[in-house]
């Protein structure tokens, strides 16, 4: 016979970003607890609001399954003394299992007898096991926790209720400073405390108290209400998924409504208005059918539609205060001169160990000019890169960015255009922040891409130089994101810039403000980001072989990893890799590089030398791999008919040099002896 179990934890309001992860954590911990304790169940439903986390376990067994375990102990010769009595070793072993020496039997394993005991444990009633639920709740972890009252324990928020029901039976247990029961709390303003009749009536009992416990249902309510507003007013609402997920975790009973603001604020840049509404007020943006921003917004109330007019007015008043700030900064910032703001960056700290933002910009300009050459930019584009690098951080000292830091770069572009800067320069100021996430938008212009690369390179090299290197999951300066941005930009623009050569050249620079250091660590860090870009289905040996190649060009390494992965599916892969691996293994022993054809002793040696001399690899990695695999029979014939490690030192050195010549060429694709040919 099975039952349904409900566990609800009632708390003060949880931060919206924690609600969903905490709900899933509770589900996972409950599933682990039940499984570890041999309580079978069918499924687990999850519920959450800002003031509660809950799970309902369906089809929970009424008793643990029985457990029978065999335990191996010491060898018989250790378990028995000379008189055949059990030793202390045997007695201690069985005592540790809760058994006696009467339970011992001997079993032979590979010719020697060992002590064995069998322990039978009858399953306990479910209610006995469920007394451990408080420990499940205590084990929950959160990004932030707090203490309250005079309690010594900490939790995400103060706990008010714990509801534990097995079907319709309330189970008593203590958690922190409360005792469980069947009481739950309704909506903070519209509902009351209520008794949950049974695990199955949970949603209905709280719905009567204006609480929608299912987050998916709340989300559907919000979306449907917004669509109704769209239809009524003939508008389009931007339903941003991240904002929607946040809003549904701010309310227990959602009611969407539309508010408005004065059209005069539409003179402020759209990005300012959208940031004010979306990021600061959690409002949805409203546009007309053509996509033009309207002086309206959609918000979601935590409650029903009573007194909604007052709620709308209150939300409008709060938004207007934000828009007033935006309008003021927009007006005042235009009075500032870019040159003056750049000069002031000399006293703005980039990092106390690295120097000022102005010094960061100076280094970035030098790097940008080198990158512009390597990327083949035109003279006009190079001039735009240089100008953008001179000023690109100026907007950090504007009032608008000081108030709305999300707009850095965006406002820089707008103010630069107003000041008469070229559109390409202004766009680069905005684009240098891109990408701002793992899958974020990339720069569109070459000028912006070069500036973005240069800024990220200096950031990476500077922090590594002063020992501020990410470790584990700790990356306070977002260096992984910056490096991922470097890799993505290089791949997207197809710039075949050898990163090892570039980094070496950058490390040769001597800046007055900072000397770069720690080159090997930087290279390994970049390689790790390139590996992240490779297809996740590509085996580790292929990734490592390609990353060790002599071609540290992002696009080519990504292409090589894909080409080898596809080649691995072909019948001749194993043999070809084995032959090339043998070449690489022996090539490591080479001490000279000159090849003397007069020392060749057989046709197979001459054939391999001719093949190596004629081998020309290009940027087509799949084609290169075909050429190398086509050499497999030639390599095999060479090894079948030629002893490399002969006594004659001159001949041996010549043959090793030949193999090294082939390995050097092939290493542009991969280091083949790192591949698994099994």
From Swiss-Prot:
Domain of life (superkingdom): Bacteria
Record InterPro entries: DALR_anticod-bd (IPR008909), Gly-tRNA-synth_bsu (IPR015944), Gly-tRNA-synth_heterodimer (IPR006194)
Gene Ontology molecular functions: arginine-tRNA ligase activity; ATP binding; glycine-tRNA ligase activity
GO CC, any one term: cytosol
Entry-linked SUPFAM superfamilies: HD-domain/PDEase-like
Catalysis performed (reactions): tRNA(Gly) + glycine + ATP = glycyl-tRNA(Gly) + AMP + diphosphate
Subcellular location, record wording: Cytoplasm
A Pfam family the protein falls into: DALR_1
Assembly information from the UniProt record: Tetramer of two alpha and two beta subunits.
Protein name: Glycine--tRNA ligase beta subunit
Organism from which the protein derives: Streptococcus suis (strain 05ZYH33)
UniProt lineage: Bacteria, Bacillati, Bacillota, Bacilli, Lactobacillales
Gene name of the record: glyS
């Amino acid at each position: 016979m099975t039952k349904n179990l409900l566990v609800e934890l009632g708390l003060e309001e949880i931060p919206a970003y924690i609600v969903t992860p905490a709900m899933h954590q509770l589900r996972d911990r409950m599933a682990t607890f039940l499984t570890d304790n041999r309580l079978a169940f069918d499924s687990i439903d999850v519920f959450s609001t800002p003031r509660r986390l809950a799970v309902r376990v369906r089809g929970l067994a009424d008793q643990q399954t029985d457990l029978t375990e065999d335990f191996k102990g010491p060898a018989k010769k250790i378990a028995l003394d000379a008189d055949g009595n059990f030793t202390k070793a045997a007695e201690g072993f069985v005592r540790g299992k809760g058994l006696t020496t009467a339970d011992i039997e001997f079993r032979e394993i590979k010719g020697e007898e060992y002590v064995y005991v069998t322990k039978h444990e009858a399953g306990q009633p479910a209610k006995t096991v469920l007394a451990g639920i408080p420990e499940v709740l205590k084990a929950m972890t959160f990004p932030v926790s707090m203490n309250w009252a005079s309690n010594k324990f900490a939790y995400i928020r103060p706990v008010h209720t714990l509801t534990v029901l097995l079907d319709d039976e309330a189970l008593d247990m203590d958690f922190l400073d409360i005792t469980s029961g069947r009481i739950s709390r309704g909506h903070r303003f519209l509902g009351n405390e209520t008794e949950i009749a049974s695990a199955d009536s949970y949603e209905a009992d709280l719905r009567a108290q204006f609480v929608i416990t299912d987050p998916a249902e709340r989300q559907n309510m919000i979306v449907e209400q917004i669509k109704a507003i769209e239809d009524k007013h003939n508008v389009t609402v931007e339903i941003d998924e991240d904002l929607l997920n946040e809003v549904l975790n701010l309310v227990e009973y959602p009611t969407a409504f539309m508010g408005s603001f004065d059209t005069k604020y539409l003179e402020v840049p759209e990005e300012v208005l959208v940031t004010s509404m979306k990021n600061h007020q959690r409002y949805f943006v409203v546009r007309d059918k053509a996509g033009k921003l309207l002086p309206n917004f959609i918000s979601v109330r935590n409650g029903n539609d009573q007194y909604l007019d007052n709620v709308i007015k209150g939300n409008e008043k709060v938004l207007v205060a934000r828009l007033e700030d935006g309008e003021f900064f927009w007006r005042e910032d235009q009075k500032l001169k870019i040159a003056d703001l750049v000069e002031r960056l000399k006293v703005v700290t980039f990092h106390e160990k690295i120097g000022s933002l102005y010094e960061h910009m100076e280094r970035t300009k030098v790097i940008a000019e080198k990158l512009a050459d390597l990327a083949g930019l035109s003279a006009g584009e190079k001039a735009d890169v240089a100008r953008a690098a001179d000023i690109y951080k100026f907007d950090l000292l504007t009032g608008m960015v000081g108030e709305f830091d999300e707009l850095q770069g965006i406002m820089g572009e707008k103010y630069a255009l107003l000041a008469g800067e070229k559109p390409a320069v202004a766009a680069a100021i905005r684009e240098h922040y891109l990408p701002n996430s793992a899958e974020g938008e990339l720069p569109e212009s070459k000028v912006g891409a070069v500036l973005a690369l240069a800024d990220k390179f200096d950031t990476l090299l500077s922090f590594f130089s002063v020992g501020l290197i990410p470790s584990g999951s700790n990356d306070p300066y977002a260096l992984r994101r910056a490096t991922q941005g470097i890799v993505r930009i290089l791949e997207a623009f197809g710039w075949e810039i050898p990163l090892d050569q570039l980094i070496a050249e950058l490390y040769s620079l001597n800046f007055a403000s900072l000397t770069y250091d720690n080159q090997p660590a930087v290279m390994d860090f970049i390689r790790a980001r390139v590996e992240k870009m490779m297809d996740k289905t590509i085996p580790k040996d292929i990734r490592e072989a390609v990353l060790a190649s002599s071609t540290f060009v992002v696009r080519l390494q990504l292409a090589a990893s894909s080409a080898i992965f596809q080649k691995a599916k072909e019948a001749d892969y194993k043999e070809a890799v084995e032959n090339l691996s043998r070449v690489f293994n022996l090539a490591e022993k080479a001490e000279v590089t000159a090849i003397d054809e007069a020392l060749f002793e057989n046709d197979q040696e001459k054939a391999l030398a001719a093949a190596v001399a004629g081998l020309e690899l290009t940027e087509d990695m799949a084609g290169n791999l075909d050429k190398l695999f086509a050499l497999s029979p030639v390599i095999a014939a060479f090894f079948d008919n030629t002893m490399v490690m002969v006594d004659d030192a001159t001949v041996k050195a010549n043959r090793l040099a030949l193999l090294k010549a082939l390995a050097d060429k092939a290493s542009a694709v991969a280091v083949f002896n790192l591949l698994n040919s099994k």
